[in-house]
């Protein structure tokens, strides 16, 4: 069984050395505003907002302090960040999400979904490459052309009456979309916690709570976009409402001349903060821009990098994992299907365990273990340069489990695009990296301001 589920071996044939710290050419702290606003790097106002949010949730029966706490700090922070630190707005979105999760048995869905149904969904939507960007954030790729109208119709037809799991639903969210959210659970409960436990990054004391995405729209015509409009709108709005701030940078590649029309639809599916993180790259901007944020060895060859990765395959194991992960049962990489991390060895290590069902049999197999480095026993030291002057405070997480963690760092009014965005080489000026850096600095400067609250997204 293990040999059938194990992904392809690493693209690099050379023997790998134990993990070493990955750094960008320039400090990620100054270049991206990262890790400002994350656990351990909150301003005084943000720290106060978090305490107030915890108090409100506890008073209204949605949060228990523990230990362990019912929800870790980074989970709460992503709702605060999505609502621009306005506590009551964050509460409303948090409550809506908790109600939605309970009504649709999201935890049960993820743990019991049929492996074939999960794999069918996985092959259609964003996929983890097995690699990370220069900050240690997981890199996903999404090829839109796989989502043609025939494929989506068949997908929705087969799943129109079932989530292929033991989950009971409220009947309001289409089963096909609920199956999609098993993939979001995989992001927040497997991939991000795994990347958090890898110390080969500039800020290992900060939990990984985002994802970097390459969205490839090459070969997609206007008719296909139009046919997918309803499905993608519903999926995007539900994700924005119930998995807020799971995305960081989104690089769109291969945009045709008519993309300004499509962009007019897309930007209305997301909240403004998410929209501000979407960047459309012209052909000559792709390689230099991606290399500024992702090491070439982790960029798929198709986009000018060195990674032998094809959309649809399982993630390619990273040589940096050597000496860190202890594989078991013949595995050399992570299999498809739901995966969760569980503490073992008195909390000194974490084990990856398979979930879901294969036929009538539940999957429960240990894949590997690795040292548990987060949460640390002591609070991370905060460099005053990383937080607005005079406002730095330390934040510790009370989490001992690793579930549903995702957030982002954007808090300023987005100005990345307008209705007339153009993407062809003749119009873009080729200064994508410079524009991205200026964009980040603008957001970092505004991190401690109090912009107006956003209305809660309604699916």
Over which residues does each language-model region extend?
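Basic, amphipathic alpha-helical/coil surface patches used to engage anionic, phosphate-bearing ligands
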Residues: 2-459
């Amino acid at each position: 069984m293990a040999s059938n589920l194990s992904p392809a071996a690493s693209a690099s044939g050379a023997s790998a050395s134990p993990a070493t710290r990955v750094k960008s050419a320039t400090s990620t702290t100054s270049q991206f505003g990262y890790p400002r606003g994350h656990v351990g790097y909150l301003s005084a106002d943000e720290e106060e907002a978090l305490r107030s949010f915890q108090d409100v949730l506890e008073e209204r029966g949605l949060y228990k302090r523990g230990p362990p706490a019912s929800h870790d700090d980074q989970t709460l922070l992503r709702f605060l960040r999505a609502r621009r630190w306005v506590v009551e707005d964050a509460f409303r979105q948090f409550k809506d999400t908790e109600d939605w999760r309970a009504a649709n048995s999201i935890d049960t869905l993820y743990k019991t979904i049929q492996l074939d149904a999960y794999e069918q969904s996985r092959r259609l939507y964003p996929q983890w490459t097995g690699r990370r960007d220069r900050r240690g954030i997981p890199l996903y790729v999404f090829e839109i052309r796989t989502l043609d109208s025939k494929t989506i119709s068949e997908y929705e037809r087969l799943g129109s009456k079932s989530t292929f799991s033991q989950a009971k639903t409220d009947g309001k969210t289409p089963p096909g979309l609920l199956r999609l959210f098993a993939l979001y659970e995989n992001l927040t409960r497997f991939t991000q916690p795994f990347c958090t436990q890898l110390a080969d990054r500039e800020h290992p004391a900060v939990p990984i709570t985002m994802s970097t995405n390459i969205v490839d729209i090459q070969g997609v015509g206007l008719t296909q976009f139009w046919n997918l409009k309803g499905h993608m709108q519903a999926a995007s709005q539900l994700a924005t409402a119930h998995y807020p701030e799971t995305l960081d940078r989104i690089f769109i590649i291969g945009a045709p001349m008519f993309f300004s029309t499509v962009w007019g639809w897309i930007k209305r599916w997301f909240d403004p903060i998410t929209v501000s993180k979407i960047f459309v790259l012209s052909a000559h901007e792709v390689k230099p821009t991606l290399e500024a944020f992702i090491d070439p060895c982790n960029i798929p060859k198709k986009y000018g990098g060195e990674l032998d990765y094809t959309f649809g395959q399982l993630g390619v194991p990273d040589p940096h994992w050597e000496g860190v992960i202890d594989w078991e049962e013949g595995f050399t990489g992570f299999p498809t299907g739901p995966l969760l991390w569980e503490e073992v060895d008195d909390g000194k290590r974490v084990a990856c365990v398979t979930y879901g069902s294969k036929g009538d049999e539940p999957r429960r197999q240990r894949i590997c273990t690795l040292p548990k480095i987060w949460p640390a026993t002591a609070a991370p030291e905060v460099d005053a340069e990383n937080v607005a002057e005079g406002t730095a405070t330390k934040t510790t997480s009370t989490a001992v489990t690793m579930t549903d963690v995702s957030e982002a760092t954007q808090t300023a009014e987005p100005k990345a695009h307008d209705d007339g965005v153009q993407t062809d080489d003749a119009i873009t000026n080729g200064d994508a990296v410079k524009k991205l850096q200026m964009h980040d600095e603008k957001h970092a400067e505004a991190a401690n301001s109090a912009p107006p609250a956003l209305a809660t997204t309604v699916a």
